[in-house]
Amino acid sequence: MEPIVFLPGMMCDARLFAPQLDALSRERAIMVAPTCVGERIEEIASNVLTSAPAKFALAGLSMGGIVAMEVYRRAPDRVTRIALMDTNPVSETPERAAAREPQIVKVKAGQLREVMRDEMKPQYLAPGPYRSEILQLCMEMAEDLGPEVFLRQSRALQRRRDQQSTLRKIKCPALVLCGEHDKLCTPERHQFMAELIPYSVFKVIGGAGHLPTLEQPKLVTDLMQEWLTQPFVLQ
């Protein structure tokens, strides 16, 4: 079985995928590659490829999905299958890029916690019994990574390229997945992504927002298990 490389989202680490790591690591090797080193998406993807196995399954959520698309663009022959979760294939709009600037100013002034609490975390999750626990975990991950990572990741996202042409070229088993209540990367955007990929499975996770790996972990893990057993008929 090929190993899996997971790519976490902005201000997240391996804990974003903890339920999936627990379930899937029983059967295969798993690596969580950092998305916090590098000034641009291209540089982050290059670092991933340097440390990744020769061939691997690739799964990214949010910013991790953006990096995953760049990894595939650079080395399609090394990616055996790809899962894109709660992510965005298009370049940043001028409006969204401008909206990051006040956040950057606040974080430079030592207000990372406030930015995460007031501006980012409220957009992340669907209503649910574990919402407060997951939000607390998001805060812990962000504070552990720190302000410099926030600044680098913000700039990298502002400068990212459009990956629609990359999606059209994907020739391996692809899973496109998002939370039903994701306000940052909507189900409609993911349906559009799935339509660009010649052979893909598109799933919307009920009862989840931007972080379904934590909000509905069993559903996501089950879908990933199915994705990992798809034959390499497209290779």
Identify the role of each PLM range.
Residues 134, 183-189:
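Conserved alpha/beta-hydrolase "acid-adjacent" motif
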Residues 92-95, 111-169:
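Conserved alpha/beta-hydrolase catalytic His-Asp/Glu region
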Residues 187, 191-210:
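Catalytic histidine neighborhood in serine/cysteine hydrolases
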Residues 208-221:
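Catalytic histidine-centered segment of alpha/beta-hydrolase-like enzymes
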Residues 73-118:
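Flexible "cap/lid" loop of the alpha/beta hydrolase fold
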Residues 1-47, 61:
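Conserved HGGG/HGGXW glycine-rich cap/lid loop of the alpha/beta-hydrolase fold
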Residues 60-64, 68:
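Gly/Ala-rich beta-loop-alpha elbow adjacent to hydrolase catalytic centers
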Residues 170, 176-178, 182:
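Short beta-strand/loop motif that positions the catalytic acidic residue
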